[in-house]
Amino acid sequence: MSEETYPGWYSFIKENHGQFIGALEQLGEAVRKAGPLDEKTSQLIQLAAAAAIRSEGAVHSHARRALKAGAEPEEIYHTLILLTSTIGFSNTSAAMSWVYDVLGEGKG
């Protein structure tokens, strides 16, 4: 993700607390490289975790990252649908609506 595509709040934190964000980004990279999962699978897992804690910003972020890693929209939606029996329909539906926004389908 290029600097200009970061959400405003993230850019503000990065500009004002660069060491903190740098450490956070290094941690993210380290944990993704710590095992055998590929980038797409890792992003889909993180997307599911974000949905489970109802973090709209993290759902947006991991949906974008999953797409960049090669996930198809159907895989992203399926990742969320799989959560229904764990986090409930309303939470799943909310997460799907956040992904819908990211995919550009929520425009208009």
Annotated model-derived regions:
Residues 77-102:
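C-terminal structural segments of small proteins and small subunits
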